[in-house]
């Protein structure tokens, strides 16, 4: 309930952790057998989860935390908060980070690696994982290499997620394109969020307002 979750937040804040990562529970009983014990009808509805997130943001910011975005909070002097204020924050599939240009090597079942412009995932089944390591010397199951369009979109998404704003000129200079022409179809799709007051668009760029930040995944 909202009351019990608020109590949890109150207890956590007493410990003053430098960072907090708070995200939705993913109910996937078909993949995780132990989740069959959880009654799905007792889980909060999407609207309730959104309300929980809003109240969490309000509570933690009142307690002195900076809302980094999506699922992360940090104290003002934490390096994530410092990097965001300086426009140097990054995000990968592990979360927010100050290390933007590092390769990530995933170790273990189902882990994901990011090496240069390529992503790969290890085998998800333990027996298959071990068998493939023995036979091939690696556990890679699938992967993909990013093309130019993927790289451009990755950078645009990263800036929106990290800064909640986007400068058209910066993207144009970095990638040699005209933003409103290259993203013409995407801007049409974004119009719904603009009409709802969640995103502001000017001649210079985009800004995601505070209420829109709750839906940054959808906006991206």
Which role does the model predict for each range below?
Residues 1-180:
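C-terminal scaffold of the Radical SAM
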Residues 158, 169, 188-191, 217:
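A generic structural signal for well-ordered alpha-helical surface patches
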Residues 179-194:
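Short amphipathic alpha-helical interaction segments
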Residues 205-209:
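Minor-groove-contacting beta-hairpin "wing" of winged helix-turn-helix DNA-binding domains
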Residues 211-220:
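Short, amphipathic alpha-helical interaction segments positioned at domain boundaries
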């Amino acid at each position: 309930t909202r009351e019990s979750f608020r109590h949890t937040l109150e207890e956590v804040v007493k410990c003053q952790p430098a960072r907090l990562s708070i995200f939705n529970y993913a109910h996937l009983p078909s993949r995780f057998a132990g989740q069959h014990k959880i009654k799905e009808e007792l889980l909060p509805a999407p609207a309730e989860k959104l309300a929980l997130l809003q109240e969490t943001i309000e509570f933690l910011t009142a307690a002195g935390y900076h809302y980094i975005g999506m699922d992360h909070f940090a104290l003002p002097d934490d390096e994530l908060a410092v990097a965001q204020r300086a426009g140097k924050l990054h995000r990968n599939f592990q979360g927010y980070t100050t290390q933007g240009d590092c390769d990530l090597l995933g170790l273990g079942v189902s882990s994901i690696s990011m090496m240069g412009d390529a992503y790969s995932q290890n085998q998800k089944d333990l027996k298959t994982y071990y068998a493939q390591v023995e036979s091939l010397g690696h556990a890679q199951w699938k992967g993909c290499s990013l093309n130019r369009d993927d790289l451009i979109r990755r950078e645009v998404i990263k800036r929106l997620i990290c800064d909640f704003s986007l400068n058209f000129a910066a993207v144009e200079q970095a990638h040699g394109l005209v933003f409103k022409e290259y993203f013409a179809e995407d801007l049409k799709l974004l119009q719904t969020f603009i009409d709802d007051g969640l995103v502001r668009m000017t001649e210079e760029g985009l800004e995601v307002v505070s209420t829109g930040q709750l839906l940054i995944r959808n906006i991206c």
